[in-house]
């Protein structure tokens, strides 16, 4: 969960961005009592964002990373798009291609269908994330080929932006392992193209998936979706 920071604490972090080593009097730019200000300064030290040495305050490495995401004029932490992987597995069964689809059984988008996916963890590269997520969500391994990056904006019908995600899309072939039909987050189903096209509430249509998987070059696409519920 994102760390919640009080406006007074953001003010302190902003000062330390531009004044790497500052004393108490240098940081107190807001009109509050010394006790009140000291409380917020101690909270930043407790959270590991600020360090005090010889009566001088400075940002820790964690504090620098956190404060660097700040809009210093608006005095707020900027929200950024999430980075994830999308994993579309295919196989031949009786001479026909089948696609592995995941029915999501958790919020948001409960009941929707799409490819396996997962967030890229801190310090993890997309390919390692793809292999880990696919193994955890399906029990399978396979050959992973990066096909493109798709940037999704999901909007509510009233115009509110609900999600902003960048997906590294991998095609997964030659799958093997102990297939898991059900996992805590949903169900995994191998289906034909005809059945895929009949699915409702899909994150990407079959034609959109095929456009990426069949591309001869690495693609970058921006796509927007408007939904009734989230």
Predicted regions and their residues:
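Conserved Nudix-box catalytic region and its N-terminal flanking loop in Nudix hydrolases
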Residues: 21, 28, 32-34, 96-136, ...
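Conserved beta-strand and immediately adjacent loop positions that scaffold enzyme active sites
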Residues: 86, 98, 187
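Short amphipathic alpha-helical interaction segments
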Residues: 30-46
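Unchanged
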Residues: 120-144, 151-205
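Nudix hydrolase/Nudix homology domain
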Residues: 3, 7, 15-33, 110, ...
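Acidic, metal-coordinating catalytic segment for phosphate/diphosphate chemistry
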Residues: 56-86
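Short hydrophobic alpha-helical segments used for membrane anchoring or interfacial signaling
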Residues: 90-92
